[in-house]
């Protein structure tokens, strides 16, 4: 699975982007650098049972153990103390990144109810794409019986593209179901 996506990039996407943008060198062609999956835990961070369930869920989705993000400073209004766990994140690179991207495009996103493609508004101006998932049940690895509370997370796809247009073209060639740009 992961080899297919990597080979698709090397054999089809690189020559296509070189022709489209007139790159002289293969190293100039935009590529995927990493995919970050992040989840804020909120109230669940106070209970170790809920925290463990969230970490296990992220590990199953990503195929890699997540790291716990801790508060850097205390905020009384949010009842947060310095060093308290507030979220969890996973950074995928290389083969795991390509495997996750393929599962996201071909298995997970089509399971979204009333799916008409993902918004092209998620680009940040520097060639990276951010996507919010509202419901973890769209991943086939997650069983409805194991979920205590529906909770979403953020997926950031970091590329080496200089512009959003290049990143859009790169992700579109990978098969990402992006809507037309406005």
UniProtKB/Swiss-Prot annotation:
Organism the protein comes from: Emiliania huxleyi
Name listed for the protein in its UniProt record: Large ribosomal subunit protein uL5c
InterPro entries: Ribosomal_uL5 (IPR002132), Ribosomal_uL5_bac-type (IPR020930), Ribosomal_uL5_C (IPR031309), Ribosomal_uL5_dom_sf (IPR022803), Ribosomal_uL5_N (IPR031310)
GO cellular component labels: chloroplast; ribonucleoprotein complex; ribosome
HAMAP family, A to Z: Ribosomal_uL5_B
Pfam family, one: Ribosomal_L5_C
Self-association state and partner proteins as the record states: Part of the 50S ribosomal subunit; contacts the 5S rRNA.
Entries under Gene3D superfamilies matching the protein: 3.30.1440.10
GO biological process: translation
Cell compartments where the protein resides: Plastid, Chloroplast
Entry-linked SUPFAM superfamilies: RL5-like
Function text: Binds 5S rRNA, forms part of the central protuberance of the 50S subunit.
Signal peptide range: none
Family recorded in the similarity comment: Belongs to the universal ribosomal protein uL5 family.
Keyword annotations of the record: Chloroplast, Plastid, Ribonucleoprotein, Ribosomal protein, RNA-binding, rRNA-binding
An MF annotation (GO) of this entry: rRNA binding
């Amino acid at each position: 699975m992961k080899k297919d996506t990597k080979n698709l990039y090397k054999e089809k996407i690189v020559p296509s982007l070189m022709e489209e943008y007139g790159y002289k060198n293969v190293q100039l062609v935009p590529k995927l650098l990493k995919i970050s999956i992040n989840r804020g835990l909120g109230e669940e961070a106070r209970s170790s049972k809920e925290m463990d369930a969230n970490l296990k869920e992220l590990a199953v989705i990503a195929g890699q153990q997540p790291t716990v993000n801790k508060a850097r400073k205390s905020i009384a209004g949010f009842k947060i103390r310095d060093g308290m766990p507030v979220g969890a994140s996973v950074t995928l690179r290389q083969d795991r990144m390509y495997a996750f991207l393929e599962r996201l495009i071909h298995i997970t996103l089509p399971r979204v109810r009333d799916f008409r493609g993902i918004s092209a508004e998620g680009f940040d101006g520097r060639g990276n794409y951010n996507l919010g998932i509202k419901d973890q049940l769209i991943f086939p690895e997650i069983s409805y019986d194991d979920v205590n509370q529906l909770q979403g997370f953020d997926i950031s796809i970091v590329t080496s593209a200089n512009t959003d247009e290049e990143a859009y073209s790169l992700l579109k060639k990978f098969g990402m179901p992006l809507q037309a740009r406005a």
